[in-house]
A protein has these predicted regions:
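A short, well-structured juxtamembrane/interface segment
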Residues: 1-11
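Catalytic core of membrane glycerolipid acyltransferases/transacylases, capturing the structured
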Residues: 9-66
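Cofactor-binding loop segments of dinucleotide-utilizing enzymes, especially the Rossmann-like FAD-
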Residues: 18, 41, 89, 121-123
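Hydrophobic/aromatic ligand-binding patch that stacks against planar heteroaromatic rings
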Residues: 28, 53, 76, 107-111
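Helix-adjacent hinge/juxtasegments
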Residues: 59-84
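Catalytic-site beta-strand/loop segments enriched in glycine and acidic/polar residues
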Residues: 77-106
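A cross-family acyltransferase "interaction/gating" segment
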Residues: 97-164
């Protein structure tokens, strides 16, 4: 993990980053000292293999067609000085590139206290792994292994009045 000094030791933090694999949340949590409450699509809670893991780490379930309760939970967590992680693309990448960001985090920030620090991050070197949505043709070119070098880069913080284009640019600058 590079840029760990950019993650505040205390206070509310909204971590926003790219979503390149199904295990991004675990990689980031293992590499950072603070507990991160990730926002996860409700479909994953319905899968037995993920359900117990997501409950154990205190992930927040979100259903896009009924996101109001999840939004209120996220705002409450931030107001309680927690770290909340969101993948604002809203899906695991199917191309390896950063997609357009959804608006949800802007709404969360508008309803949270002003002291929320927005911290961009990027997960690098997971595209083409077993855990990515890369096509089989790309996965075949990479030797299968559960061990691989992964780089997580944590960027400099942004203010709570940031917007999608600033966040996307910040995340994009951390990708390589």
């Amino acid at each position: 993990v590079s840029g760990i000094e950019n993650l505040p030791k205390h206070g509310p933090v909204l971590l926003l980053g790219n979503h390149i694999s199904y295990i991004d949340f675990a990689l980031i949590q293992w590499g950072t000292p603070r507990t991160i409450r990730f926002v996860v699509h409700d479909d994953y809670y319905r899968k037995p293999v993920f359900n117990w893991i997501l409950r154990a780490v205190g992930a927040v379930s979100i259903r896009p067609e009924n996101s109001r309760n999840a939004m209120q939970s996220i705002v409450s967590l931030l107001n309680d000085d927690c770290v909340v992680g969101i993948f604002p693309e809203g899906h695991v990448s199917t191309t390896g590139e950063l997609s357009d960001l959804k608006r949800g985090f802007e709404k969360i920030l508008s309803e949270s206290k002003d002291s929320v620090v927005v911290v961009p991050f990027a997960v690098n070197d997971m595209w083409g792994s077993f855990f990515s949505k890369a096509p089989k043709s790309i996965k075949k070119k990479k030797k299968f292994s559960f061990r691989r070098d992964v780089n997580i880069t944590i960027g400099k913080s942004l203010t709570s009045d940031t917007n999608r284009s600033e966040v996307k640019k910040s995340i994009g600058n951390l990708l390589f």
